[in-house]
């Protein structure tokens, strides 16, 4: 590929030192780095699970990965919630400016224990995008449009799903039957699997409404719910999942545990209106990778020159 993104949960809480945390990330990114593929990452809810022990938080991870020659992460927008919120622009084949935009968003980790003395029992207890992140997107999107004398089409990536992902599967806020899903398939052109509940935060961030208003983002894709692979056309914006690429996270269980290990491929074509030409799934099985393997401890990969 011309670019690769790891969309959160790059590592889990296993590292017991800063060195182990760096080694874990290095093991993930070396295949891209060694092939000279530009790459970036977003953060998921598990990337800081070992921070209390290792001292490595998201800001430290950004500083670390920026040492890699082919990494394109930046420190991100200043003064807003999260780490590494940024927009990467792709130049057109002819001329200057931005031909396409890749929005990388930090969807956070977990909801706090309480707000106003009330806990989150009975509600999804993951994190959510904050109003300052939504405002940053709106302002940055408008600035891109001014500089380019027209909207810049793009895709957005964050780890934790929006509430609208859940709505799309059933074409409903409340109804959740097989008949509702059948209606949703026809209405929203749904493709792929849903093997677990969507796990958004307890509050709707309003980011989908903001992107719908701006009209530039053609799709928003997430991870988090590792065994979902579906994509839906939800009122003109694709909402979808990419499957877990690594074999260490939970899978389907049993003989099919690793069946959905894979990645999502996105195609851009300047000859297509809006540049975005579609997406498809690629699974490990498609490449003859052994799906029966278990977790196999091994020596960590060496750091490239200039990375420590």
Go through each PLM region and give its residues.
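N-terminal active-site segment of His-dependent metallophosphoesterases
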Residues: 1-23, 27
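Short aromatic-enriched loop/helix-cap "lid" or pocket-rim segments at secondary-structure transitions
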Residues: 52-55, 116-117, 167-171, 253, ...
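Active-site environment of divalent metal-dependent phosphoester hydrolases
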Residues: 12-15, 41-53, 110-113, 160-166, ...
